[in-house]
């Protein structure tokens, strides 16, 4: 596909005025509706990326557009220095829908992960009575939870970690999917485990069938919080409201983001019990935009639409169809198809084609899809 001068103009502007911390596909997008996206030359594409699960409702969902317009014209931001008539209804909706007692609203997924880490540490010191500054959190190799300074400290991705030190201590990394590794890492100083139920950027990697239930039992036995990061896997993406439901367990804390903002703005949250979140007193944590009226209104409506429009069940049905169709191709370039619902990953045999080259080939055929790795 030839890149037009019109598209080159926008690409050059990004290259000249911004750092090279992403490697985008060579297409300049300007419009979207539902599952379709158009570039600046009005070429039409099927969006197979969904902004890494942030646009699960489809682009410019009319119900969310209405909420966005109405709320932005009424009250968009106040800071948490005041009560609003949107935050309470949103918090009530999300806690009732998820079964957690409390929700601490933030913006980006990484912010919510940081919130979970701080909450777990404070609980460890004030409730579990771990010695000051000794709390540890067990994480998994191959994880991706964001790129803030603390989070990259326990990343396995060298490109996210190298030359950004000194790194934050207090994290113990274990093999993803290994029950024994988790058991061996537990000490009296263990505050929590922090895992993705399915590793997204790692390549849609699912753990062994009973691993999450094993981790749940280990945490119960040792008075350790089980915290799951479902920023990408949550809110219907895997054919259930949450990916952990496939394992028939419940975590002590849950991190959500991406689709929570309906594809309009960053909205995230850390959900847990009163026992954990009671220790977050005034001044301990916060964000100017966290829980803002506009984000709260959109998040509340985005949650309601999951059930009103049957999006979770549709993800299950269409995901099964899509996965089976991919498997029936019996293609020599496909090594494995992984995932559940509409969160699928196709591992490509590099002997035949690289992930980046496949993305370019799909682009020529008007399909937008790319590798989870920012370097591929």
Please state what every model-predicted region is:
Residues 369-376:
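Conserved small/polar residues in nucleotide/adenosyl-binding loops
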Residues 70-74, 275, 294-313, 327-330:
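Amphipathic alpha-helix from the class-I
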Residues 28-36, 53-69, 80-92:
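A structural motif shared across PLP-dependent enzymes of the aminotransferase-like
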Residues 149, 240, 245-279, 291-298:
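Active-site PLP attachment segment
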Residues 205-239:
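Catalytic PLP-binding core of fold-type I/II PLP enzymes
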Residues 319-323, 332-361:
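Conserved PLP-binding catalytic core of the aspartate aminotransferase-like
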């Amino acid at each position: 596909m030839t890149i037009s001068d019109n598209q080159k103009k926008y690409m050059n502007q990004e290259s000249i005025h911004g750092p090279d911390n992403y490697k985008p596909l060579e297409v300049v997008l300007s419009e979207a509706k539902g599952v379709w996206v158009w570039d600046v030359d009005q070429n039409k594409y099927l969006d197979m990326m969904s902004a890494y699960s942030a646009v699960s409702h489809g682009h410019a969902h009319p119900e969310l557009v209405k909420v966005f317009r109405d709320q932005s014209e009424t009250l968009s931001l106040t800071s948490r220095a005041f009560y609003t008539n949107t935050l309470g209804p949103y918090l009530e909706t999300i806690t009732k829908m998820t079964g957690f007692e409390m929700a601490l609203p933030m913006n980006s997924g990484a912010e919510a992960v940081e919130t979970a880490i701080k909450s777990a540490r404070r609980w460890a010191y004030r409730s579990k009575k771990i010695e000051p500054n000794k709390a540890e959190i067990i994480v998994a190799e191959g994880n991706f939870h964001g790129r803030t300074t603390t989070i990259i400290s326990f990343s396995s991705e060298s490109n996210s970690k190298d030359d950004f030190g000194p790194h934050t201590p207090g994290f113990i990394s274990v093999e993803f999917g290994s029950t024994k590794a988790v058991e061996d890492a537990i000490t009296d100083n263990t505050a929590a485990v922090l895992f993705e139920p399915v590793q997204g950027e790692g390549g849609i990697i699912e753990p062994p069938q009973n691993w999450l239930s094993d981790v749940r039992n280990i945490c119960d036995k040792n008075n350790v919080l089980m915290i799951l990061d479902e920023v990408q896997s949550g809110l219907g993406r895997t054919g259930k409201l949450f990916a952990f439901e496939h394992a028939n367990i419940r975590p002590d804390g849950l991190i959500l983001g991406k689709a929570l903002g309906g594809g309009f703005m960053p909205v995230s949250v850390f959900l847990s019990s009163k026992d954990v979140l009671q220790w977050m007193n005034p001044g301990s944590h916060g964000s100017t935009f966290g829980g803002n009226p506009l984000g709260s209104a959109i998040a509340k409506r985005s949650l309601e639409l999951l059930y009103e429009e049957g999006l979770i069940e549709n993800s299950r049905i269409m995901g099964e169809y899509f996965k089976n169709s991919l498997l029936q191709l019996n293609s020599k370039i496909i090594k494995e198809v992984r995932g559940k619902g509409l969160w699928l990953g196709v591992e490509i045999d590099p002997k035949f084609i690289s992930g980046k080259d496949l993305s370019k080939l799909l682009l020529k055929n008007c399909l937008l899809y790319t590798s989870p790795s920012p370097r591929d």
